[in-house]
UniProtKB/Swiss-Prot annotation:
Phosphatase that hydrolyzes non-canonical purine nucleotides such as XTP and ITP to their respective diphosphate derivatives. Probably excludes non-canonical purines from DNA/RNA precursor pool, thus preventing their incorporation into DNA/RNA and avoiding chromosomal lesions. Pfam families: NTPase_I-T (PF01931). Homodimer. This is Probable inosine/xanthosine triphosphatase. It comes from Methanothermobacter thermautotrophicus (strain ATCC 29096 / DSM 1053 / JCM 10044 / NBRC 100330 / Delta H). Gene3D superfamilies: 3.90.950.10. Its EC number is 3.6.1.73. Keywords: Hydrolase, Magnesium, Manganese, Metal-binding, Nucleotide metabolism, Nucleotide-binding. Binds 1 divalent metal cation per subunit; can use either Mg(2+) or Mn(2+).
Length: 182
């Protein structure tokens, strides 16, 4: 007799393999069998979000727009946030929004600071990824190990940093009665 294998379908509102892999890693630990696929969607915010509102809105838009033929959809957006007492005045944070067709839950990664020349270029209108590609000599660094890996000497890569925000966004879903979720 054939056994039936149940799995959860999850869409990630991005074609970035790091975001898909991080989502699959975290949700696989929580749910077991998951099928995670990247779905290209528009974030509805500038390519380089600056500030809490833009970054969170980008993550939420990605999650909502990726919700089709799935149980959960995930939106992940990185952005620069003003933080006092930092060298540059900004910290990079990744926000994750998870949508089930009714509720959005949010989580954020550990933040880190880019070098001053990177922040200056971004504030002048360039994307972090382009500046970091030039700085490191690695093409599409953000789709690979990420700037955080370069800056931390390999102690944390972008997949690990992205896993943090996905896990934090899952906390209410892992404790639904504490958060008033079904």
């Amino acid at each position: 007799m054939d056994s039936v294998v149940f799995y959860m379908k999850v869409n990630v509102g991005s074609g970035n393999p790091v975001k898909v892999r991080a989502t699959e890693n975290v949700l696989g630990l929580i749910y077991g069998n998951v099928e995670v696929r990247g779905v290209e969607v528009e974030s509805g915010v500038p390519d380089q979000p600056v500030g809490l509102e833009e970054t969170v809105r980008g993550a939420v838009n990605r999650a909502r727009r990726a919700f089709r033929d799935c149980e959960l959809s995930v939106g992940i957006e990185s952005g620069l946030h003003r933080v006092p007492e930092t060298i540059t005045g900004f910290v990079d944070l990744q926000w994750c929004a998870i949508y089930d067709g009714e509720h959005i839950t949010l989580g954020v990664s550990a933040g880190f600071e880019y070098p001053p020349m990177v922040v200056e270029e971004v504030l002048a209108g360039r994307e972090v990824g382009d500046v970091m590609d030039e700085l490191t000599g690695v093409d599409e660094l953000g789709r690979k190990r990420g700037a955080v890996s370069f800056l931390s000497g390999g102690l944390l890569d972008r997949t690990g940093n992205t896993e943090q925000c996905v896990l934090m966004a899952m906390i209410p879903r892992m404790n639904p009665s504490l958060y008033g979720l079904k």
